[in-house]
């Protein structure tokens, strides 16, 4: 809004009508290692406020971005509670780098972020992402969480309890349609056929001897509850400010057993204080604890299975509904058993996230006017993630009614035997250190100069192990297992077992004249441990320029264009890199024990590869792919040209971009 002065003249009540100020509409947006006024941005940067995001209710902030930022695509692959099976990309070029409060973090951490804690999100879509180097080829998503402000303490609570239900379920055939279709299929067999169901089978359903099975009603619940509660407290003084929040979320799946569900706890604290003149200390701490519970069989297989069953055969062999039926069911699989953890077993996925950062900022302008606009910032961050997973397969029996003897035949469902327990443990950590010097100052009201120079070091580690054991007793503990066939091993995927490090020198300089002519250049000299010596460092520069036509005197003098608050032309070009798909491919490695022939069992013609030494069989080791020390990151050369329009005091905004992105060096 526009500033407005009003004389008090002894009045105790003053009514003031505020007017929109287009300059205030030109808000501050977050960019790489800093902020800029939207009107001064020369890159393709889009932003959305947290308060606008939460208008769309969803457990995943990633979904809340759908349709809100041009060029950002979000698609949801599954609605199963807690899976977060989503993907997003910037301009169709792969998953972007996620930066939360200045710290690179994973997509999983962003998905579990409490949306009520988000202040704003900016997306760098063009060469402006070059300052993030070898991980910015697909763009950058910058997330800023809420901070406290000076003033009275404010309490906030937001809660909801909602119900979800399928929009429409598939309509099942009645038994007569089903039997007719089976008969037609059999009779039209190329080799000739016969009736599968006789007239007596049709009559059994007509007279009530046999009844239709409504698998929809047996498996799918009418409604699935979901609840969310968030509470926050914020406030502070001119020197000390704080924001503290807690959140709880619970979502149940659509299975009637209730064994498909997800719950999450969030905690966040952002505190800043001025410890001395011009010296500010900031501490940010957050924690996430979540748990996803599922039946042992995947939701996809459960739904696929009950669709195959039809309506002709019952879920239970006895009228009382205590004995699970297998007779007549496809592959003898009973969907009721598959969806019920007490019968067939369960899987639990527990994750705990701890994130922290400590920042010390010095404003040298507080000591002398000569250094006005010069600040230095040092930050250290430590993140830790722990996963504790269980998979318990439980042996169970199924039954079939024998009409001749009037008894029930019992047998173990083959795929449930023997009972089995698997435990998995993963831990991942990240340390990050940043030191930056920033300068931002305007001379003679027309020359604005800004810049940043800094150094960044990051180390990441991942470790894991798992154990699998067949059980002598059907109880979810490894101690109940037998010694034969037990397994203890590690996952060796790129995201499971790793040690990685990055270092970088970063820089940016901005210049604007009369807030009309804008220039920016930035770079990142980035190093990655994923490559061999001599190939670890790369230089990633970018340049951009802008012209704010709406600030030109000739433009402002045209009365019919008074409604235009902003009209800006901009262009950028830069080189970005990506090392995400690479994993020390320059180093020699071996696979042990060696596998060949049947890769699933690690054997060849029934025998594991190896040799006999001293009467003992020794498994063989086989070399991995031939190492290549010349492997390095692939590059993305990006050109973007566009314009931004804003009119009628922000009531209408239009952005247009043409971009071209050329990738080189990517493996075929």
Language model feature labels by segment:
Residues 100, 277, 319:
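Short, ordered coil/turn segments that flank beta-strands lining enzyme active or ligand-binding pockets
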């Amino acid at each position: 809004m526009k500033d407005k002065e009003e004389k008090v003249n002894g009045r105790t009540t003053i009514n003031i009508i505020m007017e929109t100020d287009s300059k205030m509409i030109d808000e501050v947006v977050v960019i790489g290692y800093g902020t800029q006024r939207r009107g001064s941005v020369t890159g393709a940067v889009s932003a959305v406020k947290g308060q606008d995001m939460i208008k769309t209710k969803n457990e995943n902030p990633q979904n809340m971005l759908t349709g809100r930022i041009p060029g950002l695509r979000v698609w949801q692959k599954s609605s199963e509670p807690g899976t977060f099976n989503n993907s997003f990309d910037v301009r169709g070029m792969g998953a972007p780098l996620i930066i939360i409060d200045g710290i690179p973090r994973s997509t999983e951490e962003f998905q579990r972020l409490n949306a009520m804690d988000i202040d704003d999100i900016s997306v760098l879509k063009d060469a402006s992402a070059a300052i993030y180097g070898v991980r910015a080829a697909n763009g950058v998503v910058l997330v800023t969480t809420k901070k406290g402000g000076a003033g009275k303490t404010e309490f906030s609570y937001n809660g909801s309890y909602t119900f979800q239900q399928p929009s429409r379920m598939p309509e099942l055939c009645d038994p007569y349609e089903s039997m007719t279709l089976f008969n037609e299929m059999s009779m039209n067999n190329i080799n000739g056929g016969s009736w599968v169901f006789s007239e007596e089978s049709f009559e059994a359903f007509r007279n009530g001897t046999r009844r239709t099975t409504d698998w929809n009603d047996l498996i799918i619940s009418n409604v699935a509850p979901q609840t969310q509660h968030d509470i926050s407290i914020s406030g502070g003084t001119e020197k000390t400010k704080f924001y503290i929040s807690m959140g709880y979320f619970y979502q149940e799946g659509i299975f009637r057993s209730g064994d498909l569900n997800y719950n999450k706890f969030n905690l966040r604290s952002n505190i800043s204080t001025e410890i001395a003149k011009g010296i500010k200390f900031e501490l940010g701490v957050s924690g996430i604890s979540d748990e996803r519970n599922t039946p042992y069989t995947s939701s996809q297989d459960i739904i696929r299975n009950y669709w195959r069953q039809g309506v002709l055969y019952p879920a239970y062999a006895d009228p009382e509904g205590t004995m699970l039926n297998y007779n007549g069911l496809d592959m003898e699989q009973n969907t009721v058993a598959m969806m019920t953890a007490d019968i067939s077993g369960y899987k639990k996925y527990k994750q705990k996230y701890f994130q922290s950062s400590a920042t010390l900022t010095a404003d040298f302008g507080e000591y002398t006017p000569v250094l006005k606009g010069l600040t230095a910032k040092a930050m250290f961050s430590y993140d830790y993630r722990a996963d504790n997973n269980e998979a318990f397969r439980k042996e169970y029996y199924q039954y079939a009614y024998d009409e001749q003897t009037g008894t029930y035949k019992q047998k173990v469902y083959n795929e449930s035997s023997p009972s089995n327990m698997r435990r998995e443990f993963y831990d991942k950590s990240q340390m990050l250190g940043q030191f930056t010097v920033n300068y931002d100052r305007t001379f003679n009201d027309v020359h604005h100069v800004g810049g940043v120079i800094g150094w960044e070091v990051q180390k990441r580690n991942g470790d894991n192990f798992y154990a699998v054991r067949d059980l002598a007793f059907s109880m979810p503990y490894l101690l109940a297992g037998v010694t034969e066939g037990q397994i203890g091993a590690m996952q060796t995927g790129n995201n499971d077992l790793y040690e990685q490090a990055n270092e970088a020198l970063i820089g940016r300089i901005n210049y604007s004249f009369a807030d009309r002519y804008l220039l920016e250049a930035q770079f990142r000299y980035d190093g990655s441990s994923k490559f061999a010596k001599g190939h670890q460092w790369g230089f990633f520069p970018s340049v951009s320029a802008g012209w704010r036509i709406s600030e030109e005197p000739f433009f402002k003098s045209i009365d019919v264009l008074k409604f235009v608050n902003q009209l800006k032309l901009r262009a950028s070009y830069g080189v970005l890199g990506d090392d995400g798909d690479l994993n020390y491919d320059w180093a020699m490695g071996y696979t042990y024990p060696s596998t060949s022939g049947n890769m699933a069992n690690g054997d060849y013609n029934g025998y594991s590869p190896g040799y006999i030494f001293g009467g003992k069989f020794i498994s063989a080791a086989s070399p991995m792919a031939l190492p290549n020390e010349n492997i390095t990151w692939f590059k993305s050369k990006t050109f973007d040209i566009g314009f931004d329009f804003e009119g009628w005091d922000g009531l209408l905004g239009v952005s247009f971009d043409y971009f071209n992105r050329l990738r080189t060096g990517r493996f075929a």
